[in-house]
Amino acid sequence: MIDELFKDYYKYSDFYDIFNKYRNYEREMRFLFRMIKDKKRVLDLGCGTGTHLNILENVGYIVDGLDLSENMVELAKTKVKKARIFKANILDYKIDEKHDAIISMHSVFNHLKSYDEFEKALQNSLDHLEKDGIMVIDLDNRRSNDDVYDVVDGNKRYMECFYSPKYSMQIRTINFTIGLKTFTFEHEFFIYKKKKLEEILDKYDVSYALLTNFFRQRANDESKRIHVVIRKNG
């Protein structure tokens, strides 16, 4: 039975930085810098605890962020100096100005439940993007039934994975052991088909590429991650 405290994915902010401590942020940021280049104002959708915002702000970008979790928002505010950070949903957020670039890293769009929701979030984001602006959406594309176990600085994480082809859903039950306490929560990732993503993107006045591995390699349905890079035509 899922621990009531942690059945909601967005309540695990206390563990987020612990288990992302050794994530290759340098590689991610090199990729992002290459994609957004000379853009000045960046919006981070699903900013989490604010690591990307912190790096972008420190190299001179004007940044804003939003997250559905109030806990994440409060943690993110401690990592930035001037950034505005909002508690909001990517499906219907409203911000009073447009951005030159929009990023959404670490599988945020996988938390949507359908292609209709993906398109709704995409349309909303394009409405907030300047002409000739760039949007980067980082998607988890793993269809796995293999369990995962890892240890970070003595803290343990055991993840049970189940993929449902019928619903295009990756279901993960995650157990965190911090010291002597174990916490459990469950979340579902909607896994997108490359062809369907292309069909949606073709409806809009955009140029796009589906990449993988944080380099300029074309993604396919076997790629572990898909990075959707979109340019809003001017």
Give the positions of each predicted feature.
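Conserved class I S-adenosyl-L-methionine
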Residues: 1-48
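Class I SAM-dependent methyltransferase SAM/SAH-binding core
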Residues: 50-92
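A short acidic, Gly/Pro-enriched loop at the edge of an enzyme's catalytic core
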Residues: 94-101
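A short beta-strand submotif of the Rossmann-like class I SAM-dependent methyltransferase core
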Residues: 104-106
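A short glycine-rich, Lys/Arg-flanked "PGG" loop and its adjoining helix->strand segment in the class I
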Residues: 119-131
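SAM-dependent methyltransferase
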Residues: 136-200
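C-terminal lobe and adjacent flexible extensions of AdoMet/dcAdoMet transferase-like proteins
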Residues: 196, 200-234
